[in-house]
Curated annotation (Swiss-Prot):
Statement: the UniProt record of this protein carries the keyword Heme: no
Organism whose genome encodes this protein: Caldanaerobacter subterraneus subsp. tengcongensis (strain DSM 15242 / JCM 11007 / NBRC 100824 / MB4) (Thermoanaerobacter tengcongensis)
Binding site for substrate: 47-49, 90, 197, 248-249
NCBIfam families, alphabetized: eIF-2B_rel, PRK05720.1, salvage_mtnA
SUPFAM superfamilies xref list: NagB/RpiA/CoA transferase-like
Pathway named in the protein's UniProt entry: Amino-acid biosynthesis; L-methionine biosynthesis via salvage pathway; L-methionine from S-methyl-5-thio-alpha-D-ribose 1-phosphate: step 1/6
Function: Catalyzes the interconversion of methylthioribose-1-phosphate (MTR-1-P) into methylthioribulose-1-phosphate (MTRu-1-P).
PANTHER family associated with the record: METHYLTHIORIBOSE-1-PHOSPHATE ISOMERASE
Catalytic residue list: 238
The protein's name in its UniProt record: Methylthioribose-1-phosphate isomerase
Site positions for Transition state stabilizer: 158
Gene designation: mtnA
Record's keyword terms, sorted: Amino-acid biosynthesis, Isomerase, Methionine biosynthesis
Length: 345
């Protein structure tokens, strides 16, 4: 098994695998300031809800490092500003808000200590978030493996692997576990337009792991489902409402509709940190809209005519009634979702 480490905090620098460059180039993006982390999240150097949360936590550590020599009052003001900036890097993934909330809580708790002690406390919390995510992913993988039958053909969307987390992955983590437990699985990976996370990232991870797979255009998925060639669908999540409505990469909703028509099990794999206990339904989830160039260009080359308008939401919401279950580190949540989600609070 090849270990993929999405990020590493070492000697006061956060090193991120630059996911914009994969699969053609394996490079690291160095973050030395919280502004670097803000940019990395916005520009999708790092992406995937759990990975964004962990990166933002280390962004807070970098902010403390930046302002270490400031007087306490200015230090705390600058830290509050950094927390606010990082919390707004991307709007849809709740793990970002969750991680910043944890870092803010630590800062509030230790604000009367020396600046150097505050820095150490923040670094300790960021490290906790990192290692908790890794452990959570491995727990989800083992739990999720229970729903994978031997010789299963699995369809997945976007990237939910090690690159979307600090390591191992969510939905792709379940796939990884099924493969290494000898279940002889086969994977179809959607290319996932417009950013092509499936083609660039998931396909790369599958090749690295030696997992049998084929890459498909997004428009092929419905035909495979109709023809009975898919046994189960596994996707990730960026935010889950109390009723089970799930925001995930654009195109997920479409898959869920076809899966429901043809009675194919449709599972969301996400840590409980992705559940937003403050919203009732998916209607309350803010959907990020991204640059038109993501649709009109590929790798900087224009593929659409000048003058055409573009609608480019990064996510859509899959209604809870289309979801078979939500696989978390605490077990599989099944309908009625609201009742069972509240038990985890």
């Amino acid at each position: 098994m090849k270990e993929i480490k999405t990020m590493e905090f070492r000697d006061g620098v956060l090193y991120l695998i630059d996911q914009r460059k994969l699969p053609l180039s394996y490079e690291f993006f160095e973050c030395r300031t919280y502004q670097d982390v803000d940019f990395a999240i916005k520009d999708m150097v790092v992406r995937g809800a759990p990975a964004i949360g962990a990166a933002a936590a280390y962004g807070v550590v970098l902010a403390a490092q930046q302002f270490m020599k400031e007087e306490k009052e200015n230090f705390l003001k600058n830290m509050e500003n950094a927390l606010n900036v990082l919390s707004k890097s991307r709007p849809t993934a709740v793990n970002l808000t969750w991680a910043i909330g944890r870092m803010r809580g630590v800062l509030e708790k230790v604000k009367d200590l020396s600046v150097s002690d505050i820095y150490e406390a923040l670094k300790e919390e960021a490290n906790k978030i990192y290692f908790e995510d890794l452990e959570t992913n491995k727990k989800m993988a083992k739990i999720g493996n229970e729903v994978i039958k031997p010789n299963a053909v699995i369809l997945t969307h976007c990237n939910t692997g090690a690159l979307a987390t600090v390591g191992y992955g969510t939905a792709l983590g379940v796939i990884r576990e099924a493969h290494y437990s000898g279940k002889n699985i086969f994977v179809y990976a959607d290319e996932t337009r417009p950013r092509l996370q499936g083609a660039k990232l998931t396909a790369w991870e599958l090749v690295q792991e030696g997992i049998p797979a084929k890459l498909i255009a997004d428009s092929v998925a419905a035909t495979l489902i109709r023809d009975g060639k898919i046994d189960i669908i596994l996707v990730g999540a960026d935010r889950i409402a109390l009723n089970g409505d799930t925001a995930n990469k654009i195109g997920t909703f479409m898959l869920s509709v076809v899966a429901k028509v043809y009675n194919v099990p449709f599972y969301v794999v996400a840590p409980t940190s992705t559940i937003d206990f403050n919203i009732e339904t998916g209607a309350e989830i803010v959907i990020e809209e991204r640059s038109p160039e993501e649709v009109t260009h590929i790798n900087g080359v224009r593929i659409a005519p000048e003058g055409i308008d573009v609608y480019n939401p990064a996510f859509d919401v899959t209604p809870h009634e289309n979801i078979t279950g939500i696989i978390t580190e605490k077990g599989i949540i099944r309908p009625p979702f609201r009742e069972n989600i509240l038990k985890l609070r």
